[in-house]
Amino acid sequence: MDQGEDVLVKRTTIEKFSKTYYPDFENDGTRKYILTYDPASRLDNSVVLVAELFRDEEKGLMLKLVNMVNLVERAKDGTSMVIQKPKQMEIFKNMMVDYNLGYVDYEGIDSVFIDAGAGGGGFEVGQHLLTDFKGKDGRLHRGIIDPENEYMKLYKDDYPSADPILNLFSFKKDKTAAYEATQAMINQGLVIFPKGLNVRNELEFEVENPDGSMSIKYEKPGLDEINSITQMDLAKEELMGMQKTKKPNGTIVFEQTPAAKSNNLHDDWIQSTILVTL
């Protein structure tokens, strides 16, 4: 059953533009990616999304969601907690290295978007990314900078080697416009989503038989792949759980549907997804 007309993205739309494929965990030397990061310090989820940016002959530039990671860990008592910020930074920097494999810094990465809201310390994260760093490959890699940010551009002369691919975005300032832009891109079929796993945690590929008939080929992904696809499923659910509402004063806002609220959906996965379409 589909949702109402005011929903951000309908389930039928997500299903229409979903395909079966494995996540990407590194660049093969031919692709270009966008990374987004919605950091958290304590209670929320801290989500990183990776999308491949490519050009379709008919539609032009498109996005394909290829990996999503929630930077949380299990405490000794079994509760979920956000990984400490220094470790988060190390993981994110090494993801930048992975998705730039085969390229000079950072020709394999189109852009990096970070939610600069105060809650997750997004601006602080951006400051940590200014400095050159040694990656897990043992090599020194350039830092990155947002040259348009009113505060970060003050550091430009202090970090001359920083690559200007960083974008610090404030949802507080431009949330409605950002959500509407994402809605338009998805409805136009410019974003490809991964299909979810079946009940046995398998990927289902449609294959054509020699006689022209179609059948299903089942493949069992690894644990990291299962986790990635599961995280992207959560992003899809949050997209479908958001609706446009007009307040009495005429202001347009996007907020969770009553059903999403009753299911205790968050907004951490959707924020990273919104960022990737900016």
How would you label these PLM feature ranges?
Residues 1-153, 176, 180, 201-278:
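RNase H-like, metal-dependent nuclease domains and their acidic two-metal-ion catalytic environment used
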